Amino acid sequence: MSHSVKIYDTCIGCTQCVRACPTDVLEMIPWDGCKAKQIAPAPRTEDCVGCKRCESACPTDFLSVRVYLSNETTRSMGLAY
């Protein structure tokens, strides 16, 4: 099941999220849109298991990486509204 993974321009390019991901969803690429000149897009969101380890690993005050779980997953976890 695919989840939505969003990388924000507050990314500092530290690679912590990339290293924390157990399914290699993230990878670092050059990007001029942030201070670090690199960002971790999520080219393989279909492999995301929704563990949010990337979020936990992010050292920025405003999480630069966010995982939005699909409706089915949030419903099964009892988190749906």
Swiss-Prot record:
Binding site for [4Fe-4S] cluster 2: 21, 48, 51, 54
Enzyme class: oxidoreductase
Entry note: cofactor: Binds 2 [4Fe-4S] clusters. Cluster 2 is most probably the spectroscopically characterized electron acceptor FA and cluster 1 is most probably FB.
EC nos: 1.97.1.12
InterPro entries membership: 4Fe4S_Fe-S-bd, 4Fe4S_Fe_S_CS, PSI_iron-sulfur_center, PSI_PsaC
Superkingdom per UniProt: Eukaryota
Molecular functions per Gene Ontology: 4 iron, 4 sulfur cluster binding; electron transfer activity; metal ion binding; oxidoreductase activity
GO cellular component labels: chloroplast thylakoid membrane; photosystem I
Swiss-Prot/TrEMBL catalytic activity: reduced [plastocyanin] + hnu + oxidized [2Fe-2S]-[ferredoxin] = oxidized [plastocyanin] + reduced [2Fe-2S]-[ferredoxin]
Membrane topology summary: Peripheral membrane protein
Main location class: plastid
Residues reported to bind [4Fe-4S] cluster 1: 11, 14, 17, 58
Annotated localization: Plastid, Chloroplast thylakoid membrane
Signal peptide range: none
Record domain 4Fe-4S ferredoxin-type: where: 2-31, 39-68
PROSITE patterns from the UniProt entry: 4FE4S_FER_1, 4FE4S_FER_2
GO biological process, one term: photosynthetic electron transport in photosystem I
The keyword Transport belongs to this UniProt entry's keyword annotation: yes
Subunit structure: The eukaryotic PSI reaction center is composed of at least 11 subunits.
Function: Apoprotein for the two 4Fe-4S centers FA and FB of photosystem I (PSI); essential for photochemical activity. FB is the terminal electron acceptor of PSI, donating electrons to ferredoxin. The C-terminus interacts with PsaA/B/D and helps assemble the protein into the PSI complex. Required for binding of PsaD and PsaE to PSI. PSI is a plastocyanin-ferredoxin oxidoreductase, converting photonic excitation into a charge separation, which transfers an electron from the donor P700 chlorophyll pair to the spectroscopically characterized acceptors A0, A1, FX, FA and FB in turn.
Protein name according to UniProt: Photosystem I iron-sulfur center
Organism of origin: Chloranthus spicatus (Chulantree)
GN (gene name): psaC
